[in-house]
Amino acid sequence: DIYIRAVRDTFGDIPVVVANDGDVSALAGAMSLGENNILGIAMGTSEAVGYVDENGNITGWLNELAFMPVDANPEAMADEWSGDIGCGVKYFSQDGVIKRAPRAGIELPQDASPAEKLKAVQTLMDSGSAAAEAVYRSIGVYLAHSLALYYGYYGFKYVLLLGRVMSGRGGDVILEKCREVLADEYPE
């Protein structure tokens, strides 16, 4: 309850809730669309996922899809924290962008922070770099297949994508490629 105490110490006895950013993204989607049955995915430092069910409730489920396998290739990237391969966090986060950059021919400064490395790829994207676009297209392909997998668990009607990875032109490319793959591979 460290966060609740910090708020009370600073602002007094006001209502406060500490929530997962994935749950907040799903709730934001439900509120902005005026709809329910929404999967919210925040792609930033990690992949955060939340779900608002068909009745408009945050389920309270443990939606840690960051550690759900989305790539079964034995050569898939390994997550340093869990040791598992092919985890969503390696595809739908700033780390996903950073790990794909060298494969697309982009050299990033080794001494830069992860946020600075993401910004460098975003800057390349804004300047029209084909290599940076390839990074975001790849993420869009993985996202499409992962959404089909996630759908099997949640049966969502809407998806809201947020976070630094989805900002700017790169996010547009992710969404475009994701829609294309969904239409081709999962037309239903």
Identify the residue ranges that each predicted region occupies:
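Conserved phosphate-binding loops in N-terminal lobes of ATP-dependent enzymes
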Residues: 1
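ATP-binding/phosphotransfer module of carbohydrate and carboxylate kinases, centering on a glycine-rich
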Residues: 8-16, 28-37, 54, 72-188
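Active-site metal-binding loops of divalent metal-dependent hydrolases
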Residues: 22, 45, 165
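Eukaryotic endomembrane system proteins
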Residues: 52-69
